[in-house]
């Protein structure tokens, strides 16, 4: 079997396709959560604690300046506000995944429905057994 046909067989397996769909949906979900955190959740929280824009929160370790030659030196900044936004995004995504896994586990633990009656094979075996009993009763000399 050639390399291309083996790869095609591998790529068309259900697990690989499911994984690809999951990655695409996950990327889209990440963008939705980012917008939710940055545009809907954090602004009211920032407003409630004094009109704080979390994305601009930072510690300035060294302010921007100009050296002796007139060259601009950028500031050294730790942007912890973006980190806070990212942590909130992570918590939301982790909670959503937790809920999905919990739902999947609950669905997979459901007990299968009890069979509604004997299977076709069991019915056939019973018929054969009964027929053999009748034959034995009618003709007891047959071993």
UniProtKB/Swiss-Prot annotation:
Membrane topology: Multi-pass membrane protein
GO CC list: plasma membrane
PROSITE patterns: MSCL
Subcellular location: Cell inner membrane
Gene3D superfamilies: Large-conductance mechanosensitive channel, MscL, domain 1 (1.10.1200.120)
GO molecular function, one term: mechanosensitive monoatomic ion channel activity
Pfam entry (one): MscL
Transmembrane segments: 16-36, 84-104
Keyword Membrane among record annotations: yes
Keyword Ribonucleoprotein appears in the UniProt entry: no
Assigned keywords, A-Z: Cell inner membrane, Cell membrane, Ion channel, Ion transport, Membrane, Transmembrane, Transmembrane helix, Transport
Cited function: Channel that opens in response to stretch forces in the membrane lipid bilayer. May participate in the regulation of osmotic pressure changes within the cell.
Family the UniProt entry places it in: Belongs to the MscL family.
Entries under HAMAP family matching the protein: MscL (MF_00115)
Quaternary structure, from the entry: Homopentamer.
NCBIfam families: mscL, PRK00567.1-4
Protein name stated in the entry: Large-conductance mechanosensitive channel
């Amino acid at each position: 079997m050639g390399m291309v046909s083996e790869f095609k067989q591998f790529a068309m397996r259900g697990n690989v396709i499911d994984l690809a769909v999951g990655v695409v949906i996950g990327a889209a979900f990440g963008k939705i959560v980012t917008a939710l955190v940055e545009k809907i959740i954090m602004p009211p929280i920032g407003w409630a604690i004094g009109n704080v824009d979390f994305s601009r929160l930072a510690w300035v370790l060294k302010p921007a300046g100009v050296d002796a030659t007139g060259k601009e030196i950028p500031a050294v900044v730790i942007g912890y506000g973006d980190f806070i936004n990212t942590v909130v995004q992570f918590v939301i995504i982790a909670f959503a995944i937790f809920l999905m896994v919990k739902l999947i586990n609950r669905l997979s633990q459901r007990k299968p429905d009890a069979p509604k009656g004997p299977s076709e094979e069991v019915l056939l075996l019973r018929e054969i057994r009964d027929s053999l009993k009748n034959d034995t009763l009618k003709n007891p000399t047959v071993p």
